Amino acid sequence: MYLSDGKKETQYIVKDIGLPTGIEKRLEALGMTRGTSVTVLNSKSKGILIVKVRGTRFALGRNITEHISVAT
């Protein structure tokens, strides 16, 4: 399952991040690494996903979240 398929108010564990190195490093700097808990707070209509990682909230586009593999 990918994070882009996540449901609101649900917590997931990041299994893999299949993005270019630069974007993956940026997500790591924000605290999103393999094994990290991620909560989907909201899913906006234009493809934006609001997530909470290690106490920090931020928005990610579908073009990024569809490459982040997660498990419940």
Task: Kindly give the residue locations of the regions a language model identified.
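Compact, glycine-rich, soluble single-domain proteins
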Residues: 1-72
